[in-house]
Amino acid sequence: MTLRDRIYLTWCYGKTQLVIGLVYNLVCASWLSMGISYSFFVDAFIIKTIIYAITLFLIYQFRNRDAIFFYINLGLSRRKMELSVLLLDFLSLAVLLTAVLIIYG
Amino acid sequence: MVRFGDKTVLSGGYITSETGKVTGLLGRNGAGKSCMFRALMGGLKVENVMVSIDEKPVNRQRIGLSVKYLPQGRMLPENMKLSRAFELYGVNYWSFVNRFPKYSRFHDAALWELSGGEARVAELGLVLLSEAPFYILDEPFSQIDPINIEAVQALIRERSRDHGIIVTDHNYDAISKVADNLFVIADGYTSPVHSRDDLVRHGYLR
């Protein structure tokens, strides 16, 4: 399986989490572009973790319980898929904030 | 052991599959058939689950590479094109169309565009035509019309020549036509079935 396939599957699996995460990431980036402080980063990541946990909880209440087997059949466990979504979400926040810092630095 | 609240659904599930054979699993509604499969495949957290092939334990984090599972409900992402799903599973879409010609027009269709029965056949083809030594099919005949049931039975027989397949379904006639050996699940335990009397004794038939 190629990296492109893996990213595509992560997107399919965690679309809702990633979209909500991206909206939050963009809000953070726009706040950061208006003023920078050290505590902002800590707060941004703490709030993100809380939002992530709440989203995950809500998604689990309504998720199709058989959908996971599409990924398990490909050798990807539930844990791997959750970690991939988490990684992609936090990575996009880190990349966005770094980009804003470089641009407005 | 599989437990929901105070209710123990499964306490001693055991099933084997041999290459070249189709194993049928029967059981009444709520007996724990799907729970057992979900537990085996890592879709349900349970205590003490063990899967082994040729007496070697299988890495359950990658079990899908050894055992492909067709769950009872829909598993394909609703917006994914059928051709993309087949590509990810390493299956040539046109080899599936050879068996089910109607699907030539669904090449670029997403799952939500198909009816329940059409989606079921597509998912079944996807699982059975992908490469793995073993397959577990949970109610493969549900929602499927009689003509397609025959085609599905033929596909199961064909794939069982060099693979091991476990099938469960409430369509007793359909399952008995493809199964080489049968198990019944009742009161939280699985038992082999040697005759119709065994099914009566376990409360599956009258």
Annotate each PLM feature.
Chain B
Residues 26-28:
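The feature captures the beta-strand-to-loop junction immediately N-terminal to the Walker
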